[in-house]
Amino acid sequence: MGSSKKQGHLVLPTVELIDQLQELLKDSIRPIEIGAGAGNLGRFLNIPMTDAMIQRKPEIAAYYKMIEQPTINYPQEVDHLEAMDAVRRYHPWTVVASWVTQLYKTKADEGTSMVDGVDEENILKHVKKYILIGHEKIHGTKRILKTHRFTTIDPQWVVSRGEASGNRIWIFEGENE
């Protein structure tokens, strides 16, 4: 785990996680990963990997340095695309995201969102399924949990920076039928 933290990885692509995601993607057409970071999930799933690469912005990199957190070293195979641009380019049925922060929209979002965050409500308008891997303490207050239908998997085998009991996989029903 120490090495993954030093390299900016938030979740590790365990065999169990990849198997579960492959099962969730089995009937999907053109699935993609957004917020892919180093591409650890998409690479094993053999799907396009995209990321807005905001950690390359000087002000974001400086913030991470200040809080002593590593920034991601984005590999070439990760496309530099904001999440909605990736959805427009690839027209996926399913989007996979891991530890993404939602887009800041209202004052009520403070502390749980950012101006460079993902507009998950908009993504859900364009896909059939949105799979979010995250942690209850960090992602459990997302707006989409109040506005969209979802099921939850509480996997004890997801390895992340958070305590294992809070790790979750949320599977949202998109609006694009």
Give, region by region, the residue ranges found by the protein language model.
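C-terminal substrate-binding/active-site "lid" region of AdoMet-derived donor-dependent transferases
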Residues: 105-176
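S-adenosyl-L-methionine
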Residues: 1-26, 53-94
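Conserved class I S-adenosyl-L-methionine
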Residues: 28-37
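Short glycine-rich anion-binding loops that position phosphate/pyrophosphate groups of nucleotides
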Residues: 100-103
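Conserved acidic E/D residue at the C-terminus of a beta-strand in Rossmann-like folds
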Residues: 49-54, 134
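Glycine-rich SAM-binding Motif I of class I
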Residues: 39-43
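Redox-cofactor binding/interface segments in oxidoreductases and associated redox assembly factors
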Residues: 95-98, 132
